[in-house]
Amino acid sequence: MMQKLEVSERKACSVLGLNRTTKRYKSKKSDDEAVLREAIVRLASKYGRYGYRRIAAMLKSEGWKVNHKRVERIWREEGLRVPKKQKKRGRIYLRNGSCIRLKPLYQNHVWSYDCVEDKLANGRKIKCLTVIYEFTRESLAIRVERTINSKHVLDTISKLFLTRGIPEYIRSDNGSEFTEKMLRKFIEDVGAKTAYITPGSPWENGFIERFNGTLRDELLNREVFYSLEEARALIENFRREYNSVRPHSSLGYTTPLSYFLF
């Protein structure tokens, strides 16, 4: 308009009722916006159950200088799912019985184990023995079998003792695979202690229950396993990513394997 009518910027803005500052404003969006947007969509597509805060933490680990608010804005613009906010809950620790009030305070203080069931495509059941290191939330092992008994538990933890040391306590429910006399004697003989939760109180084993929920939510409910071997391979891949890739909010959005580096 200014060139066509040969008028000054001041005159043109006065006629149109515009502020000169507004006229001169240019978007200050970063030049990396498109690349960042692509990265967010890529991570959200790969890790479909992660929220924008966890994606923001992963971007930072990739070298991006970005805060969660910017990631949230792009997340919403792309129509990605933003998890609903949940009320904060106090962490539940054991208050009675053989487990007493047991809180993981340092390395190799408390491990916990439990079992998770699933099915193959043909309907046959499989069972996963999950073992975690409570202090860092690291998944130490996930053993996948048709069924799990005390011999499987003994074999799994004895191998872990050789590579990871012996914990002071191993927390579990009162399932027969964990209470068999041979297993309890072995744990006692190596210098560890069993810590059994109150029967019918899975919330007392909160660390492993939380892990099992994540395993089911992010893998078991999303995959169809056509064989035991395929289930083992995919579940082991999940375990490795859980330890080395997936940021944990309880660890300040670091991963279990990098926790001691910070």
Which positions does each model-derived feature cover?
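Active-site beta-loop-alpha junctions of metal-dependent nucleic acid enzymes
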Residues: R124, I142-R164, S176
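An active-site-proximal beta-strand-loop segment
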Residues: H109-L140, R146-I148
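Acidic/histidine-rich, metal-coordinating catalytic segments
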Residues: I157, R164-E180, T254-L257
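C-terminal domain-tail junction helix/linker
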Residues: E188, T214-F262
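RNase H-like polynucleotidyl transferase catalytic core
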Residues: K85-K87, I170-N174, E188-F207, E223-L228
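Basic, flexible linker segments flanking DNA-binding modules
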Residues: L18-V110, S201, L257-L261
